[in-house]
């Protein structure tokens, strides 16, 4: 689940794997390979890295961990709505 959502969020953000990795603090030489391994669920990032990735992609960490796709979408919509609401205040 995390891999699929990571790839979707990255593509929606218009970033290449290497760009996302570098912005999240990964070494430039291995950034693309590491993000690829996370997207393909060969390896799993630790929570600290997921938090950094979430900041770069502007999605909540919970989006990556929701068991059901429907719940993940609700989490994402809530995040967007909350962000818009705060901008209006």
For every predicted segment, state its role.
Residues 4-25, 81-86:
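Short basic helix-loop element that most often maps to the first helix and adjoining turn
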Residues 5, 16, 46-49, 60:
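Residues that mark the N-terminal boundary/hinge immediately upstream of a DNA-recognition element
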Residues 6, 17-21, 32-38, 64:
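Conserved hydrophobic/aromatic packing and binding residues within compact polymer-binding modules
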Residues 14, 32, 40-55, 71:
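Short, basic-rich loop-to-helix N-cap that marks the start of a DNA-contacting helix
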Residues 15, 26-30, 59:
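The short coil/loop that forms the "turn" connecting the two helices of the helix-turn-helix
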Residues 69-89:
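Interfacial/linker helices and their anchor residues that mediate assembly or domain coupling
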């Amino acid at each position: 689940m995390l891999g699929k959502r990571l790839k979707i969020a990255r593509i929606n953000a218009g970033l290449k794997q290497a760009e996302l990795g570098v912005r999240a603090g990964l070494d430039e030489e291995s950034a693309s390979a590491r993000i690829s391994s996370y997207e393909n669920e060969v390896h799993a990032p630790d929570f600290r890295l997921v938090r950094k990735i979430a900041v770069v992609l502007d999605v909540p960490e919970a989006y990556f961990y929701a068991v059901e796709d429907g719940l993940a979408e609700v989490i994402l919509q809530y995040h967007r709505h909350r962000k818009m609401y705060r901008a209006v205040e």
